UniProtKB/Swiss-Prot annotation:
SUPFAM superfamilies: HLH, helix-loop-helix DNA-binding domain (SSF47459). Residues 1-79 are annotated as: Disordered. Keywords: Activator, Developmental protein, Differentiation, DNA-binding, Neurogenesis, Nucleus, Phosphoprotein, Transcription, Transcription regulation. The gene is NEUROD4. A motif (Nuclear localization signal) lies at residues 73-79. This is Neurogenic differentiation factor 4. Probably acts as a transcriptional activator. Mediates neuronal differentiation. Required for the regulation of amacrine cell fate specification in the retina. Serine or threonine phosphorylation within the basic region may regulate neurogenic activity. InterPro entries: bHLH_dom (IPR011598), bHLH_transcription_factors (IPR050359), HLH_DNA-bd_sf (IPR036638), NeuroD_DUF (IPR022575), TF_bHLH_NeuroD (IPR016637).
Length: 330
């Protein structure tokens, strides 16, 4: 009886252990099945991955639709390319240099055919072109109207639109004298003196003075003042204005006196021996010509007699001679 009891007890334990093993195996299978089935979070992750892939595909399509970048593509700078660039630059510089040399030579040839060519005063490019235009215009007017190219209108055409130094150069080279141009400008500025200046034409030449290319405008204005003053005085006093000033012959030498055994004295003019009243009332031609003033200008100046305080008695020469000899003999 005891054996059976023990066998039955062992059998029950064996059955219990087998059931426990079956339960364990079934639990493992359930875990595998649960891992194989996607949960709710797994579905959300899968949807996000699909959305990201779709967006990447759309971006790739958009990149393909954009226009390509224009312009030269940047290439790597090599020694060969640098040499080509340098050679191209040298050729361009040589071409520009040749062009400028040709332009300068053409302008020099144009300056030589102009009426006021000067080696010392070189006209600028713009002044050369303006003078050439005025020269062509003036020559065409001369051919059409038949006027001489030595009048004032010809000079006005040449100097139109030019600077003052260029106008002086033109007037000096044409030997027309800048005083006529100055008078015309002065008439425009001062219309009150128009009648006095325009009614008298004067020619005043100053020998030994520089020509307009080498002199300044102030020197020409300075030389214009004496004839203008003379013409105005002539007009006011009613004297004929056809008198010209003689050329300057140098300053008069003063009388020399050397204290010693001999003395040198310049021969005086016979007019100097005459009294002052006689000279003032009746000036001689020699004195007026020696000082460079015409006689009519001396007559036009008002006369003033200088009073002498001391008493002056005039003795005849035949009486003064014996008296002086008697004084020296004593």
């Amino acid at each position: 009886m005891t054996k059976t009891y023990t066998k039955a007890k062992e059998m029950a334990e064996l059955v219990g252990t087998q059931g426990w093993m079956d339960d364990a195996l079934s639990s493992k299978d359930e875990l595998k099945a649960e891992n194989g089935r996607p949960g709710p979070f797994g579905l959300v992750a899968g949807l996000n991955e699909e959305h990201d892939s779709i967006e990447e595909e759309e971006e790739e399509e958009d990149d393909g639709e954009k226009p390509k970048r224009r312009g030269p593509k940047k290439k790597k700078m090599t020694k060969a390319r640098l040499e080509r660039f340098r050679a191209r630059r040298v050729k361009a510089n040589a071409r520009e240099r040749t062009r400028m040399h040709g332009l300068n030579d053409a302008l020099d040839n144009l300056r030589r055919v102009m009426p006021c060519y000067s080696k010392t005063q070189k006209l600028s490019k713009i002044e050369t072109l303006r003078l050439a235009r005025n020269y062509i215009w003036a020559l065409s007017e001369v051919l059409e109207t038949g006027q001489t190219p030595e009048g004032k209108s010809f000079v006005e055409m040449l100097c139109k639109g030019l600077s003052q130094p260029t106008s002086n150069l033109v007037a000096g080279c044409l030997q027309l004298g800048p005083q006529t141009l100055f008078l015309e400008k002065h008439e425009e500025k001062t219309p009150g003196c128009e009648s006095a200046i325009s009614s008298h034409s004067f020619t005043y030449q100053s020998p030994g003075l520089p020509s307009p290319p080498y002199g300044s405008m102030e020197t020409h204005l300075l030389h214009l003042k004496p004839p203008a003053f003379k013409s105005l005085v002539d007009a006011s006093f009613g004297n004929p204005p056809d008198c010209t000033t003689p050329p300057y012959e140098g300053p008069l030498t003063p009388p020399l006196s050397i204290s010693g055994n001999f003395s040198l004295k310049q021969d005086g003019s016979p007019d100097l021996d005459k009294p002052y009243a006689f000279m003032a009332h009746y000036p001689s031609v020699s004195l007026a010509g020696a000082h460079g003033h015409p006689t009519h200008f001396q007559n036009a100046v008002p006369r003033y007699e200088i009073p002498i305080d001391m008493s002056y008695e005039s003795y005849p020469h035949h009486v003064a001679g014996p008296q002086l000899n008697a004084i020296f003999n004593e």
